[in-house]
Design a protein with these regions (language model features):
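Two-component system phosphorelay core
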Residues: 1-53, 57-59, 63-103
């Protein structure tokens, strides 16, 4: 678990229930993985409206667990979607995949 996320989760729910912390983190990692897979397809199709919705979902997920580093990359993806900029979207997605590979 990324230290930044662990610290944020402990502040929110305490550290007494390690199972809860691990469950929240596992759900987060799963959700992010699913959304990034969707984003890849949406970029390939040039479906920027759908990509914006996916990026919005990712924004919520990252902010819910205090993952500010990934949140910043998600915002770059969302900006690219709003601008219908496939090159910027691909760059942002590559950064997100790099960040999430560390999870």
């Amino acid at each position: 678990m990324k230290d930044q996320i662990r610290k944020w989760l402990v502040e929110q729910v305490g550290e007494e229930d390690q199972t809860l912390l691990e469950t929240i983190y596992a759900d987060y990692v799963s959700t992010v993985g699913e959304q990034l897979t969707k984003a890849e397809v949406e970029i390939a199709r040039g479906d920027f409206a759908a990509l914006d919705v996916t990026a919005h979902t990712l924004k919520g997920s990252t902010s819910t667990v205090g993952d500010t580093e990934t949140y910043d990359a998600v915002m770059a993806l969302r900006d690219a979607a709003k601008a219908s900029d496939s090159a910027a979207a691909q760059t942002a997605l590559s950064r997100l995949l790099e960040l999430t590979a560390q999870m």
